[in-house]
């Protein structure tokens, strides 16, 4: 057989990169600027036995390549790359180590931790400067040539506009492991997420875009395995083109199973966004294993210390950092992104530690090579691009600094909203966050949707834990409860953790509604953490990255137990869809429209009057209203159907506040749509109030009113503007 393979070898082409089957054979292409020889290793179907090593015959523009006739999908392979082993010069070539193809689309076998995986001899004098001659192939996963054919039928991307986007962040495994409608054999898999009952539920929430935690092939950290834990979240990538085998039923159908899931989501009108980790790899620092990039071309792929190239720049906190200033690294990342869009049909990406991607030799640059590559790319520039705009390096915090076309996680929104609802942030701090954080994003023609607003995410407390714990409880992570954020801006409402106190539980439930309502009534793009809609808990663990168990898995029994909260979320998303003024494509203007004498946004105090300067500087200003008047539309072309007028009242005081309803005419009437103190306010119920009437706003609650155009008999016509009503605002339950 080896003689047959060698006889079918042709010179091939340098592009496309990776293993590309053209129907007659497979072209193998691998970039390495400093290698002296590259061997293609072919294995049996299970990846257990090496059949032959074939030296790639050609080297063009720093790319090694060759073509094998009659080798196609299902062929199992890896690489051995020869070159200098000079760690102090940044080179770590070791042909004894079988390497993963950076462009591999599928894998067979699993990584089994062994000292042979390391390019140096562990424990030997000289540490990583030594050279290890053991063969790592028995312990390595192997690459598989993939068949890209797939019948998408009529499935197409829903192309949800940014202004209608509501993101729902979840984890493939955690979301399905305990779902009663998912067959046991599908749990934890892409196919489980594609079960009709799962998709129907997600769709019913009113969200538009499902953001999946990393699905690229990743490695479980050895230190975690030694503790009986795993790298559950998956932020430890080793293959940027391959779906992780853990999430597929048949490892030889990984690409197809992922595509089937995407097709089912698209058929339901839901987008699929991937959380991607292009900032580092699973190979760690100089003491990490040699699995792929480190052995292919360490000097080119990684950022090394300028004066000590033995060591890695660690702006990620994981041991290494990909060099996104190198053209071939940029090419690999953009090739990967295009693959997931064009071949796998995903609709966007959230970039973990996104600042890394824009780092040039002198630091962050919003005109970096990678960002410019995305901006000009006809494929990537049309999908959703979301940055986590920080990293661990110097000058790493860059919220608001990404270029036009990008959205960004807005941690200032998260922190300020959390502070407000525990009484620690006044109106002056909350107001900018409510109208799209214009102070951060209103530049370069960016739109309010550039602000990804969130209260909770995978990293940190769940919503239920945010209102139930003052302190992290990460003992299960086996790091002496020292990992995870120490300052969470959380408030347990009086008791730490679960309680039987009815008053505490009622306050917690109201606080959760306050957070959800604030999120879905704010300008910008809202993101919900899966399970928050029914009060999922992680038992106070705010860093469950290593918990592949009940701590992280969604408990679906809570969906029935807390059905009222689920219904509240559905009501809020429906209101956001109904009122375009809540999701404007332009930043709201506080300037008066001279033609009609109205402002798009007016901030009002509890007296129903516009807030005065001294109130803006009052650190105790915890009750105020945001009046959104769609009739003004002070900027841009006037949009039909955008002329609703809404009043949102926020009260973070402990006590009830009488709030006088404002109006621009004696006939102004307000319909109560939401009172977070009344979780079961009937959807069809109409409680209507006149301008000047006072509504008793319960302590720590939020109200939403809409301006009524028609007369309703429920209005107390004896009221005068500014006079308080003796009628109860609504039935308290």
Residues covered by each model-derived region:
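Core domains of carbohydrate- and sulfate-ester-processing enzymes
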Residues: 83-151, 222-230, 235-236, 268, ...
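Beta-sheet entry/capping signal
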Residues: 27-29, 165-166, 208-211, 269-271, ...
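Substrate-binding/active-site clefts of carbohydrate-active enzymes
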Residues: 136, 159, 171-346, 353-379, ...
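Carbohydrate-interacting/catalytic domains
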Residues: 1-168, 173, 190, 499, ...
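A generic secondary-structure signal for well-formed alpha-helical elements
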Residues: 75, 83-85, 174-175, 179, ...
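Conserved, mostly hydrophobic/aromatic
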Residues: 30, 79, 170, 202, ...
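Conserved alpha/beta catalytic core and glycan-binding cleft of carbohydrate-active enzymes
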Residues: 345, 360, 366-530, 535, ...
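Short, polar loop/linker segments at the starts of domains and inter-domain junctions
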Residues: 53, 179-196, 469-474, 682-691
């Amino acid at each position: 057989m080896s003689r047959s393979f060698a006889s079918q070898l042709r010179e091939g082409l340098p592009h496309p990169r990776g293993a590309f089957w053209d129907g007659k054979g497979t072209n193998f292409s691998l970039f390495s600027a400093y290698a002296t020889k590259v061997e293609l290793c072919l294995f049996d179907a299970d990846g257990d036995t090496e059949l032959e090593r074939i030296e790639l015959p050609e080297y063009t523009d720093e790319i090694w390549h060759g073509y094998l006739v009659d080798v196609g999908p299902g062929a199992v392979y890896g690489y051995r790359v020869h070159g200098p082993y000079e760690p102090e010069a940044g080179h770590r070539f070791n042909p004894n180590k079988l390497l993963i193809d950076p462009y591999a689309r599928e894998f067979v076998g699993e990584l089994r931790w062994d000292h042979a995986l390391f390019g140096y001899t562990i424990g030997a004098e000289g540490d990583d400067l030594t050279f290890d001659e053991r063969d790592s192939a028995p312990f390595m996963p192997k690459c598989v040539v993939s068949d890209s054919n797939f019948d998408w039928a009529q499935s197409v991307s829903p192309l949800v506009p940014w202004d209608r986007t509501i993101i729902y962040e979840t984890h493939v495994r955690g979301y399905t492991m305990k779902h009663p409608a998912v067959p046991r054999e599908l749990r934890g898999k892409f196919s489980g997420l594609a079960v009709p009952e799962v998709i129907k539920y997600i769709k019913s929430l009113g969200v538009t875009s499902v953001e999946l935690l990393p699905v690229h092939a990743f490695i479980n950290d050895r230190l975690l395995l030694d503790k009986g834990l795993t790298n559950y979240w998956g932020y430890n990538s080793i293959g940027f083109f391959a779906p992780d085998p853990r999430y597929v039923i048949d490892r030889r159908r990984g690409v197809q199973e992922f595509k089937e899931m995407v097709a089912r989501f698209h058929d339901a009108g839901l987008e699929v966004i991937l959380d991607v980790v292009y900032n580092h790899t699973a190979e760690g620092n100089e003491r990490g294993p040699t699995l792929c990039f480190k052995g292919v071309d360490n000097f080119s792929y990684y950022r090394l210390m300028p004066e000590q190239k033995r060591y890695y720049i660690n702006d990620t906190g994981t041991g290494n950092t990909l060099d996104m200033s190198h053209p071939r690294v940029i090419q690999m990342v953009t090739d990967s992104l295009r693959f997931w869009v064009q071949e796998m049909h995903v609709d966007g990406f959230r970039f973990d530690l996104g600042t890394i991607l824009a780092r040039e030799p002198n630091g962050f640059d919003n005109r970096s090579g990678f960002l410019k590559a995305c901006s000009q790319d006809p494929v990537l520039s049309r999908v959703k691009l979301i940055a986590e705009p920080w990293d661990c390096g110097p000058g790493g915090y860059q919220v608001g600094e990404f270029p036009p076309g990008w959205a960004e996680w807005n941690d200032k929104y998260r922190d300020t909203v959390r502070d407000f609802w525990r009484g620690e942030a006044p109106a002056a701090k909350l107001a900018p966050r409510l109208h799209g954080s214009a102070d951060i994003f209103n530049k370069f023609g960016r739109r309010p949707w550039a602000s990804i607003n969130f209260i909770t995410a995978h990293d940190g407390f769940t919503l239920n834990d945010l209102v139930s714990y003052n302190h992290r409880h990460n003992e299960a992570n086996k790091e002496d409860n020292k990992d995870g954020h120490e300052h969470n801006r959380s408030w347990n409402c009086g008791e730490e953790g679960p309680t039987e106190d009815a008053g505490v539980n009622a306050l917690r439930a109201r606080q959760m509604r306050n957070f959800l309502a604030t999120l879905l009534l704010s300008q910008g793009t809202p993101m919900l953490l899966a399970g928050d809609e029914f009060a999922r808990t992680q038992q106070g663990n705010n860093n469950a990255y290593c918990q592949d168990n009940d701590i992280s898995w969604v408990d679906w029994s809570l969906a029935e137990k807390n059905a009222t909260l689920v219904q509240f979320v559905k009501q809020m998303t429906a209101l956001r869809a109904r009122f375009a003024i809540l999701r404007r494509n332009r930043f709201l203007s506080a300037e008066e429209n001279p033609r009609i004498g109205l402002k798009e946004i007016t901030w009002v105090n509890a007296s129903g009057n516009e807030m005065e300067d001294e109130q803006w500087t009052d650190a105790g200003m915890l009750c105020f209203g945001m009046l959104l008047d769609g009739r003004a539309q002070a900027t841009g072309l006037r949009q039909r159907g955008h002329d609703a007028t809404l009043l949102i009242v926020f009260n973070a005081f402990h006590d009830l506040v009488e709030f006088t309803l404002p109006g621009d005419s004696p006939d102004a009437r307000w319909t109560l749509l939401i009172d977070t103190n009344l979780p079961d306010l009937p959807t069809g119920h109409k409680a209507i109030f006149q301008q000047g009437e006072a509504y008793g706003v319960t302590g720590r609650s939020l109200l939403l009113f809409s301006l009524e155009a028609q007369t309703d008999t429920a209005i107390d016509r004896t009221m005068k503007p500014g006079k308080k009503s003796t009628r109860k605002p609504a039935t308290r339950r």
